[in-house]
Amino acid sequence: MLMRLLRMAERDGGRCAGLVLLIGAVFGVGLVRLLQEGLQLSPQQSLRVLVLAMLHLVGPLVVALIAFTRLTPLWLRRGRQGGPHGGWLTLGPAFLVGPLLLIHALMGALVGGVLASAQGGLELGLLHGVGAIVPMDLLSALLRTALYLAAAALLCFWEGQRRLPRQAGAEDLIASLIAREIALMVGLKLIWTLAVHPMTLPTLP
C-alpha cells in the first residue's frame, strides 16, 4: 500500500510541479527586484525576506491553489471509485505531495531571486538563500501545506461518497469544491497563525 501511495503521489506531483516551479521563480524575481530597487535592501536582506514570504504565506498558498485546480477532479474520482481503500488512496497521496511541491516552489523562488539579485554567482546566492531558512519555519510550512491538501482531499472523498456517480464529475461540482477548498484553506491558515505557529518577523542585519 505504501509503495502504491508513493507512486500516486509522484504522479500527482508531476501534474503540478512545473507550474509550481514557474510561479515560484516569477515570484522570486519580482519580489527581489521590488525589495532591492524600491526599498533599497541588500541582496542578502532581499533573500531573507523572500524566504520568509515563501514559508509563512506565499509558498503553501500557491502550492495549495495549484493542487486544488489540478487534482480536485482526481481526488473526487478516487474517493468515488477507490473501494474500501478509497480514503487512503485519496488522502495519502495528497498529504505526501504537498511538502514536495512546497520544496519545488521554494527552490524556484530562490533561483529566481538569486538571478534577479546582484549576487556574485548562482551558487553563492543559493547558499545565502538556503542559509536564511529557519528549520522550524520550514517544518511548519511543510506541515501546513500537507494539511491544506489532505483537508481538501478529505472534502473530495466525502463528496465522492455522498454524490451519485453521474453527479460527481459535473463541472459545477468541481467549481464548488474548489471554492470550498479555498475557504477551508483560509480558515486553517487563520487557525494555524493564531493558535499553532504565530508569525514572527526577524530583524534584518
Report residues per predicted region:
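Final/C-terminal transmembrane alpha-helix of multipass membrane proteins
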Residues: 170, 176-196
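Long, hydrophobic alpha-helical segments
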Residues: 52-72
